[in-house]
C-alpha cells in the first residue's frame, strides 16, 4: 500500500480498533459509514432498464431505447468504487437494491438499470469478512 492508504490509516479495521467502552454499545447507537446505491458501479452502459426506473423512461424506451438507456446510465451510477475498495475505505453499510429479471434466473443489483448478479459481489464482501473477522 502507498503512504496515506486506507490500510495505513486504519480505515479497513476501524471497527476492530474501537475503544473497549464502545464495544458494548448496540450497533443502532453507532454512526456507521455507508454508501448509497452501493453496487451501482456494476451497471454497464446500455444496460436494460430495471423495475425501479422512472415510469417515463419505461414509456419512452420502445421508441428511444438507446437514448433512454444512455440517459438512465448517466444518473444511475452513484458509486465508482468496487465493494472491496469501499470496505477497505471503511464502508460498513451497503445500500443494496436487488431485483429479478423476468426472463433470466438469479438476482441482480439495480438502480434504474440492471447491474451484476449479486453472487460475485456478495463473495467479495464475504472474502473481506474472512480476512477482517472483527469488522
Label each region the model flagged.
Residues 1-89, 102-120, 124-132:
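Long, acidic (Asp/Glu-rich), low-complexity accessory segments flanking structured domains
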Residues 135:
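Active-site-proximal binding-pocket segments
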Residues 92:
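Extracytoplasmic glycan-interaction modules
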